[in-house]
Amino acid sequence: MVLLTSNECNFDLEATDFNLPGVDGRNWSLQQCMGRNGLLIMFICNHCPYVKSVQERIVRDALELNQLGIESVAILSNDTTNYPEDSFFNMRLLAEKLKFSFPYLLDESQAVAKNYDAVCTPDFFGYNKDYKLQYRGRLDASRQETAPEDSKRDLFEAMKLIGETNHGPQYQVPSIGCSIKWK
């Protein structure tokens, strides 16, 4: 397992469009995912312990952000041939098990991850309603183990600020996780 941190936030970088299949049987574009106050794009996978430690918090935060007009989407860009736990079938099972309220998309060509410069799982990208990047940080202090329940909710607080002001926080702690499994 190669451990990486996400890159710094390149404020105001415009989101790149995509058209990816979801576990719900639909294809999703950037515009279809955008909420009235913003969008959270999450590069995740099924097998990484850093993702597993925050899965339930991702689900919680996505539900709460939805109430603020901020939609969420998860994208899996790993090589599913060499990492069968990340297969489309297993993506669907995980989404059903955890009751994902957001689309879970497969980036089989890995082009979307490359366009976004995603490097690890989880890697979070918070956009304002104008499709401008405002957050590229961690969910919270969790690593391979889930952080205490009363830990600061970095991602949620940043996305709430983006929804209210159209701007993200200047100070951001990078996300940390397994490298994306490139083909």
Where are these regions (language model features)?
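Chalcogenol-based redox active-site neighborhoods
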Residues: 1-163, 168-171, 179
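Amphipathic alpha-helical surface "interface" segments used
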Residues: 175-183
